[in-house]
UniProtKB/Swiss-Prot annotation:
Its cofactor is a divalent metal cation. This is Structure-specific endonuclease subunit SLX1. Forms a heterodimer with SLX4. It is an enzyme of class 3 (hydrolase). It comes from the Eukaryota. Catalytic subunit of the SLX1-SLX4 structure-specific endonuclease that resolves DNA secondary structures generated during DNA repair and recombination. Has endonuclease activity towards branched DNA substrates, introducing single-strand cuts in duplex DNA close to junctions with ss-DNA.
Amino acid sequence: MMNSSQFSDSQTTSLHRIPTFYCCYLLQSINKKQSFYIGSTPNPVRRLRQHNGNLSNGGAYRTKREGTRPWEMVLVVYGFTSKIAALQFEHAWQHGYKTHYIPMDDRIMKNANSGRTVHHKLGLVRQLLANVYFRHMNLKVHFFSMPILDVWNLNKFNIKMGSNEISVDVSQVSQETKTNLEQASDDDDDNGACSRDERNLQLVTELYDNTVTKENEIKEIIKDILVLGERNCNLCGQCYDYTSEDDTMKMHIFICPNSTCHYEAHLNCLYEKFIEEESGIDSKNILLPNFCMCPGCLDEMSWSDFVKISTMIKNSFSN
C-alpha cells in the first residue's frame, strides 16, 4: 500500500491505479475432487473458460491433464492493490512451506509434498490474510461452493486471525441452496458435470460483472461532481479543479460515492486526519490507517478504498 508521501501531485510519471478487479483463485476438478489449482487473474471469467478449454488460447498445463476437466472456481481472494501484490499472494499460496509471509513455526505445510488437501489450501489463505502486508489491502474472500465454505468455517488448523476482520461472502445462489453446484456431481454422466461447470461460470460472471459495474457507477457519480469545476477540500479548504488546464489543480482527492454524502477532501488531508486519530488511541507509530470512516456520512471504509477511489479519479479525469 501507499502512504501519504507517495501522493505528490507534482509527479509527472505514470500513476499507479488500483485494478478494478484482480484476484487469486482456487480451482477444483469436478471429476477428481482432490485435484486443485491455484492461479491469479484480472478476469476470472476468461481465465476459467481458458482452463476448461472453452477458449483456444491460455489455460495451464496442469488443468489440461486427462480426466481433470471440467474445473470449477470454488473461491477467489480479490481486492489486490496491484498485479504484483496478487502475484506475491499467488506464489505464497502455492509455496506455503517456504513463503516468508508465514513464520516458519506457524507453517501448516512443512515441505513441497505436503499440504495437498483443501483444508491446507484454505488454511494458507487464512495465514496469508493475517500477514500485515496483505491485511492492509482489505482483501475479500468470495466462495462459489457451500462445501468449500463449510471447510473454511471448520478451520481445521484453528488459525487465529487476530483482530483482523476478513470480508467473507458467498454467491447468493449458493445461499439459497446448499446443493446448488453439488447436485450435478451426483450424476456420473458428462451432462451432469457440464451443467455444474456452466452454473459455476455463471456465478463467477456475476461477481466479476457486479464489481466492474459498481466501479463504473462510482465513476459516473464522481464525474457529475468534477465537471462543476472549482471545488474545495472539506478539511483544509484548498481549491482543486479537474476542469482546469493547470495540472497542479488536479490533486489526489477523495469523493465519497454515497449518494447522500459526496464528502470531498485531499487524500493527504484524510491520511493525516486518520493517522492522528489512531495515534491518539494507540501510542505506537502507525504508517497506514486501520480504521477509517468517511467524515461526511460516517460509513466505514478501508484505507485501500480511499486510495482506490482517489487513484481512479486521478487516472480517469486528469487528462
